[in-house]
């Protein structure tokens, strides 16, 4: 933890990135070219990577507008070495295939800030059921659970949620 504090100014970040030192160690041998941060979030890892090597360039990708706006401010001192891309990471490699990519970082999952912000609809304490990583997407979780058929919900829970009792869960949702 002490080493972590020395390498990262905690006051600058609303979220502490996981495995920070380990991630920096993985990328320390990259001296030129681009690193893609597929899930930039609040730029904890990105900031560390840019500080660690003054010649590496970064492509910062995220689908969350709020996270990207924060990251742009946070990485302002590195603006000549950073490109921002709004979108899901699924097409990022194709979009930047002509760049000299030397490394890829993907911190997959929901950020604790998304969970903590009640208006995002990820928390059990939220008043609305939203759960959109990209707030510009039209389809939210409330629409899914309130308008999809029992068969459609069963398929979602079985295929994506890997829920054993998927039929029971879908039935309870449709009944209520």
Regions found by a protein language model. Name each.
Residues 1-176:
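S-adenosyl-L-methionine-dependent methyltransferase catalytic core, i.e., the SAM/SAH-binding region
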